[in-house]
Amino acid sequence: MADLLGSILSSMEKPPSLGDQESRRKAREQAARLKKLQEQDKQQKVEFRKRMEKEVSDFIQDSGQVKKKFQPMNKIERSILHDVVEVAGLTSFSFGEDDDCRYVMIFKKEFAPSDEELDSYRHGEEWDPQKAEEKRKLKELAQKQEEEAAQQGPAVVSPASDYKDKYSHLIGKGAAKDAAHMLQANKTYGCVPVANKRDTRSIEEAMNEIRAKKRLRQSGEELPTTS
């Protein structure tokens, strides 16, 4: 009988020591604080969502606004705002490099931003429609000029022999032909001495010399022959 009573008493849970009681008390307090923080966080999210719903509603009713930029928010707040905007049937984007500096912009559906506008915001620039239009026109003009140049092909350089036709009415076809040959010779220096390459005379001086030679030939042809 004594052995049975001893076994029953030994199987019963011993009362907690003072150390165990303190640990359990701290655990209960910590759980209570955590629950309170969770409730506060939940309440803050609810209040934030209501505030965003109010701002989005005011934005929709304001016909003078087509877009709205919000202050930087954390990731959770941005997620809530994006959800509110989607429910309202609007468009929203987040911009900013660092997470602490990222912000949300919302747009009315009929005024959705273009790719150029979004690119400006992504680079931290303000969107200027007038400058964007000027940039677009310059780009189109440059592209048009490139296409026209490609269709025309390489530029044709007029040969030196064109001087014959240019000056034939002034000094005669024969003299103009000589001038053309002279100009052509001045361009082909590959097989002549260096001294012959340096012809510093102007075109007028060369033509005057040719005229003089022509007059000299003509005067020689007109002299009477002696028997």
From Swiss-Prot:
Motif (Nuclear localization signal): 35-51, 122-139
A Pfam match: R3H
Main location: nucleus
SUPFAM superfamilies cross-referenced by the UniProt entry: R3H domain
Matches recorded under InterPro entries: R3H_dom, R3H_dom_sf, R3H_sperm-antigen, SPAG7
Bias kind Basic and acidic residues: ranges: 21-45, 119-147
MF-aspect GO terms: nucleic acid binding
Modified residues (N-acetylalanine): 2
The R3H domain, residue ranges: 46-109
Region (Disordered): 1-45, 118-161
Localization, UniProt: Nucleus
Domain of life: Eukaryota
A Gene Ontology cellular-component term: nucleus
Signal peptide: none
Alphabetized UniProt keyword annotations: Acetylation, Nucleus, Phosphoprotein
Modified residues (Phosphoserine): 114, 158, 202
Protein's name in the database: Sperm-associated antigen 7
Native organism: Mus musculus
